[in-house]
C-alpha cells in the first residue's frame, strides 16, 4: 500500500495540534505504508521553517522503518486532477492512499467513496481510519455488519464463504447484510461484488441466476451506480472465510450470515487492515488463490465477471 502525498499536506500533517493522533498515524505509516512524496526533493525549501520541520520528521520517520525508504517524484498531477481520477487508476492504485492539495476537486472525488483520498487538513482523519486495532470480537456479539464494518471506501468486494448459499432460510433471513454494509461508502460509484462459495453446498431451492440479479439490484440501489456488477463463483477448492476489499480483509470463523445461523460462542470476526504489511501480503495471496479458481474453473462462474483485482477470461 502506497501513500501519495503532496508537500503542502505534509506541512499540514506536521502542523496538526493533535500531536498524539499524529504520532499514531506516523507509526501506522512506518509499519506498513510506502510513502511517495508527490514532488521532487529539490522542491523542499530547506531554509524555511516548514522545510526544516519536514526534513527533521523525515529523519525520525526513517528510523526503524518497516517499508521501503520514501520515494520522491510526482506520481499524480494534482493541479490537473479530475473527478474521474479513481477510474483512471490501476488495480494497485485503487488500493493506495492519496493526500493531495486541490481541495475543490479532491472533495468531489472523496464524496464518491471509491478510494481513500483527502485534501489539505484531512491527513489525520484519513490515516486514522486505517488504525483498526482490537477489532477481533465474538461473532455473536455483532448485532449487524453495518455497525461493525468501518467507513472505508471500496470499489471491489470479494467474499469467500463455503456456506453462503447452503441454507435458503438462513440466506434469505440475512438479506446480504454483509454486502450492504460494505457498500455503504460508495456514492454514484460502482462496486464489483464477487461471492465465492462451495460447489455442492447450494440449497436446491435457490436459483443462483435469480439471486444474482436480486443482489445486483440491491448494490445498484445502494451505490447509486448502474455500473455495479455481481459475479458468483462455485468451487470445490475450499478456503477459509475471508472478505477482501481495497483497504482491509474481514476474517470470520464461521459463515458470514449472523441471523438464525446458530453461531458458536467461540467464533470470532476480525478486520485486518492492509496498512499492516503482513495483512496486505495475506490478502494478495488470497487473491492469487481466487485467480486460480477462475483459471481452472471457468464453467462454474456466472454473472458479470468483472473485477479490478481478478482477471476473467473474455
PLM-predicted stretches and their roles:
Residues 150-156:
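Secondary-structure "cap/kink" motif recognition
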Residues 162-179:
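Domain-level signal for Mg2+-assisted phosphodiester chemistry and nucleotide/NA-binding surfaces
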Residues 159-162, 197:
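Short glycine-centered, acidic/aromatic-flanked micro-motifs in structured strand/loop junctions
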Residues 1-146, 175-314:
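PLD/PLD-like phosphodiesterase catalytic module centered on the HKD motif
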Residues 156-158, 248:
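Structural motif
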Amino acid at each position: 500500500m502506497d501513500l501519495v502525498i503532496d508537500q503542502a499536506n505534509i506541512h499540514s500533517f506536521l502542523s496538526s495540534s493533535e500531536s498524539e493522533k499524529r504520532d499514531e498515524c506516523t507509526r501506522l505509516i512506518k509499519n506498513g505504508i510506502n510513502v511517495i512524496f508527490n514532488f521532487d526533493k529539490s522542491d523542499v525549501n530547506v531554509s524555511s521553517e516548514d522545510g526544516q520541520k519536514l526534513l527533521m520528521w523525515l529523519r525520525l520517520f526513517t528510523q526503524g522503518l518497516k517499508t521501503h525508504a520514501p520515494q520522491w517524484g510526482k506520481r499524480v498531477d494534482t493541479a490537473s486532477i479530475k473527478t474521474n481520477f479513481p477510474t483512471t487508476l490501476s488495480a494497485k492504485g485503487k488500493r493506495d492512499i492519496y493526500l493531495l492539495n486541490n481541495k475543490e476537486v479532491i472533495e468531489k472525488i472523496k464524496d464518491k467513496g471509491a478510494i481513500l483520498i483527502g485534501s489539505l487538513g484531512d491527513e489525520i482523519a484519513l490515516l486514522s481510519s486505517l488504525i483498526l486495532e482490537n477489532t477481533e470480537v465474538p461473532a455473536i456479539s455483532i448485532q449487524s455488519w453495518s455497525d461493525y464494518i468501518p467507513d472505508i471506501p471500496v470499489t471491489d468486494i470479494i467474499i469467500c464463504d463455503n456456506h453462503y448459499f447452503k441454507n435458503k432460510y438462513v440466506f434469505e433471513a440475512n438479506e446480504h447484510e454483509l454486502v450492504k454494509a460494505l457498500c455503504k461508502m460508495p456514492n454514484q460509484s460502482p462496486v464489483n461484488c464477487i461471492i465465492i462459495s462451495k460447489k455442492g453446498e447450494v440449497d436446491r431451492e435457490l436459483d443462483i441466476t435469480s439471486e444474482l440479479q436480486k443482489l445486483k439490484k440491491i448494490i445498484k440501489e445502494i451505490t447509486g451506480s448502474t455500473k455495479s456488477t455481481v459475479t458468483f463463483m462455485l468451487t470445490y477448492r475450499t478456503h477459509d472465510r475471508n472478505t477482501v476489499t481495497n483497504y482491509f480483509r474481514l476474517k470470520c470463523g464461521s459463515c458470514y450470515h449472523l441471523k438464525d445461523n446458530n453461531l458458536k460462542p467461540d467464533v470470532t470476526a476480525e478486520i485486518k487492515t492492509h496498512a499492516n504489511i503482513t495483512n496486505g501480503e495475506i490478502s494478495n495471496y488470497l487473491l492469487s488463490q481466487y485467480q486460480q479458481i477462475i483459471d481452472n474453473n471457468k464453467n462454474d462462474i456466472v454473472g458479470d465477471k468483472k473485477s479490478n483485482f481478478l482477471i476473467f477470461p473474455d
